[in-house]
Amino acid sequence: MLHISNDNYFEWRFGNIYYTKKGTGSPILLIHDTLPGASGYEWSKIEDELAIDHTVYTVDLLGCGRSDKSSITYTNFVYVQMISDFIKKIIGQKTDVIASGFSGSFVTMACHNEKELFNKIMLVNPPSLTQLKQMPNRKDRLLKAALEIPIFGTLVYHMIVSRDNINNLFIEKMYYNPFHVDNQMSDAYYEAAHKGGYYTRFLYSSLAAKYININICHALKALDNSIYIVEGETEPNGKAVTDDYCASNPAIEVSVLKETKHLPHVEAPEAFLEQVKIFF
């Protein structure tokens, strides 16, 4: 499923970043979630339609999909720098951004650090502000060390991203209607989760041990960009999460897509595109 259609790699300091570029017009950068197996394929149902009016850049984050799976400790700041450098060196101008899930925290911090790079921002089911405040403790650090042990860590990681567990992830957490799960999408997640061999476990170990968490409240309050949140109707605690974001920054607008969960742009691409056209 994860075809490499061209040689579009951004040579970055921590590894090569795979991306695609489609269409012409004002730029939009699409950034996928950080769940195990996530990649730019997450946007496959909407990127061609967006490319009619925009230049659409879709990236595979470092450690994900077709990008390098570097054996580093992944932190929020690593992705903040990656996104900012990508905009500066590849897009080359101020850009709109749509970020899914946990990646919304990267975009928020990147915009806070270098606001001249960002225009409008759309966050799709962003992470809980309370969750983001949780920092690694001793138990988390031990977990990370265990997951990075060559044989043991690889075995545990492969159990976590087994075919059955990926399918269960979609059925239980990603889709409003489990009978409508897109098999091609779950296949792409499974492929991405195993691409890169045993190095794939390093991103998961950093995620599981909370190394990617960061308190974004101060950044969110300071932003004066137009920010729009798209929430899946049945996303767990979705209303509480968006209420917290709006309390931090009252200028934020929110739209709820009916009969969707964690991936509204996959479950209801037409309804999602309507929101994109309204906002951008």
Regions found by a protein language model. Give the residues of each.
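Conserved loop-alpha-helix segment in the C-terminal half of the alpha/beta-hydrolase fold
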Residues: A222-T260
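Conserved alpha/beta-hydrolase "nucleophile elbow" surrounding the catalytic nucleophile
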Residues: H32, A99-G104
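Conserved HGGG/HGGXW glycine-rich cap/lid loop of the alpha/beta-hydrolase fold
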Residues: Y18-R66
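Flexible "cap/lid" loop of the alpha/beta hydrolase fold
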Residues: H112, K120-T154
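Active-site loop/oxyanion-hole signature of alpha/beta-hydrolase fold enzymes
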Residues: T58-I98, E274
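Short glycine-enriched nucleophile-adjacent loop
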Residues: G104-K115, I121
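Conserved alpha/beta-hydrolase catalytic His-Asp/Glu region
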Residues: L132-K133, H158-A219
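Catalytic histidine-centered segment of alpha/beta-hydrolase-like enzymes
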Residues: T260-L273
